[in-house]
Amino acid sequence: MQKIVLFLDIDGVINVPEVYSSEFISCYQRFDLYGSPVPLARQFLQAVDRSESIKPFWMSKGWRKHAIVWNQWAQTRPWRVAYPISFVQMREVMAKYPGIFLDEVEDGKTLAAIWHSGNVDRVVWIEDGFPESAIFWAKLDNRVTLISTLHECDRTQIGINAENIDRIFAALNLKLD
């Protein structure tokens, strides 16, 4: 069975407040947390969680360690949080890839993705747009598939939706129930 690492951003991917209504997601330290999930968010998270071949990671600058509230909302197991990584880990990645110009601040997500990718068969990263470093890394490493949830012509089509769900499911070898 082919092992796939999935890096999943939240804002602009499964949470799109500019387009969808706000709803209660979970509580954290007695505070209510709200999000605006895309219509396919819960089904998608559950399908990923059921897969034995996918090792999912949250990759969110905004939610960071609180990303796991989305697992609670979707009634799935908590996933690991990939971002941020330590400066020691960042420097190890930068030493391993001297051909890629990597900045510790600007390219933090790319550094985290490289760090957590290890020796898996395939890497799928779903994000609302990618930095140049991620694009360059994907060109160097044929295991990497980058899927942007930005729609260049229609800004209301941000997030996981009918325009990109087939590509996402094909990359992950998934099917909705």
Where are the predicted features?
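Short intrinsically disordered terminal tails
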Residues: M1-K3, L176-D177
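C-terminal cap/substrate-recognition subdomain and adjoining C-terminal extension
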Residues: N71-D177
